[in-house]
Curated annotation (Swiss-Prot):
Region annotation Alpha N-terminal domain (alpha-NTD): where it falls in the sequence: 1-233
Keywords: Chloroplast, DNA-directed RNA polymerase, Nucleotidyltransferase, Plastid, Transcription, Transferase
InterPro entries: DNA-dir_RNA_pol_insert (IPR011262), DNA-dir_RNA_pol_RpoA/D/Rpb3 (IPR011263), DNA-dir_RpoA (IPR011773), RBP11-like (IPR036603), RNAP_asu_C (IPR011260), RNApol_insert_sf (IPR036643)
Annotated GO biological process: DNA-templated transcription
Function: DNA-dependent RNA polymerase catalyzes the transcription of DNA into RNA using the four ribonucleoside triphosphates as substrates.
Identification of the protein by name: DNA-directed RNA polymerase subunit alpha
Location (main, coarse): plastid
Subunit structure: In plastids the minimal PEP RNA polymerase catalytic core is composed of four subunits: alpha, beta, beta', and beta''. When a (nuclear-encoded) sigma factor is associated with the core the holoenzyme is formed, which can initiate transcription.
Cited CDD domains: RNAP_alpha_NTD (cd06928)
Pfam families: RNA_pol_A_bac, RNA_pol_A_CTD, RNA_pol_L
Catalytic activity, EC: 2.7.7.6
Enzyme class: transferase
Length: 339
């Protein structure tokens, strides 16, 4: 059935989700197709997306735990069934969902006897537990048990050297990889000059985001990687004589805007990336951390939205306003700008 639907479309390149299911709170599955592709293109797209999905998607996890006066991670605590090492391994498996950046504090403070699960973690408002039933420890006696935790959003594997900290804190080898697995396959169809390829992409996630969200983020990361090449191609390239280094020209927002003004259809705000706004590194990094990638993303935010961004200051707001006021048409600012 899928083959018949795809084979009928031989002109426009299209993505389509053909299957989506939730196997458990910590296992989401999605199956997508992209077609029609010329011979060889499916492999190119499949390899790039698979690597981006597995290595470029950010996740939130617990990176450190502090127990108090515990001599080493192989110690046992009176009244607790698990050793410190087993508790650390259980904390490592906790799946969190958030859009935070930087390090945040969390804690567990309960009184036994009882089972401790992920539901007992006291989290910042911006962090959510995917599966509250995940086990942490079993208190077998009426004792007070408290753990201080650190939470961080990152990507890939984060390992730290094991040290005996005098304050009783221990690092956790965090795995900030929301995408569990990615498979892709290629199906060829058609005859002669009409032959083309269909890319099938399967994505499994840990529940902190859906396969569709993961695919969108991976695609956006790939686009950001290739933006410098697009700028160089549009503006031309320059080589300095008697030197072995290549210097791409600065692609400014004003030049881009001038070209867009010539377009009778108007200014496609979703095609102007914040990389082109001549912002300071600090302001640019704040916006990127908040998933603001294009001018359309920026203009859809209110002043309150921006000030809620981690490390965003009033000076950054003024810098953004001055930049937009300098380059954008006044009528566009009145219609679109909400801060």
């Amino acid at each position: 059935m899928v083959r018949e639907e795809v084979a009928g479309s031989t002109q426009t390149l299209q993505w389509k989700c053909v299957e989506s299911r939730v196997d458990s709170k910590r296992l989401y599955y999605g199956r997508f197709i992209l077609s029609p592709l010329r011979k060889g293109q499916a492999d190119t797209v499949g390899i790039a997306l698979r690597r981006a999905l597995l290595g470029e998607i950010e996740g939130t996890c617990i990176t450190r735990a502090k127990f108090g006066s515990v001599p080493h991670e192989y110690s046992t605590i009176a009244g607790i069934e698990e050793s410190v090492q087993e508790i650390l391994l259980n904390l490592k498996e906790i799946v969190l969902r958030s859009n935070l950046y930087g390090v945040r504090d969390a804690s567990i403070c309960v009184k036994g006897p009882r089972y401790i699960t992920a539901q007992d973690i006291i989290l910042p408002p911006s962090v959510e537990i995917v599966d509250t039933a995940q086990p942490i420890a079993n208190l077998t006696e009426p004792i007070d048990f408290c753990i201080d935790l650190q939470i961080k959003r990152d990507r890939g594997y984060q390992t730290e050297l094991r040290k005996n900290y005098q304050d009783g804190s221990y690092p956790i080898d965090a795995v900030x990889m929301p995408v569990r697995n990615v498979n892709y396959s290629i199906f060829s169809c058609g005859n002669g000059n009409e032959k083309h390829e269909i890319l099938f992409l399967e994505i499994w996630t840990n529940g902190s985001l859906t396969p569709k969200e993961a695919l969108y983020e991976a695609s956006r990361n790939l686009i950001d990687l290739f933006l410098p090449f697009l700028h160089a191609e549009e503006e031309g390239t320059s080589f300095e004589e008697n030197k072995n280094r290549f210097t791409p020209p600065l692609f400014t927002f004003q030049k881009r805007l001038t070209n867009l003004k010539k377009n009778k259809k108007g200014i496609p705000l979703n095609c102007i990336f914040i990389d082109q706004l001549e912002l300071t590194s600090r302001t640019y990094n704040c916006l990127k951390r908040a998933n603001i990638h294009t001018l359309l993303d920026l203009l859809s935010k209110t002043e309150e939205d921006l000030l809620r961004i981690d490390s965003f200051r009033m000076e950054d707001r003024k810098h953004i306003w001055d930049t937009l006021e300098k380059h954008l048409p006044i009528d566009l600012l009145k219609n679109k700008l909400s801060f």
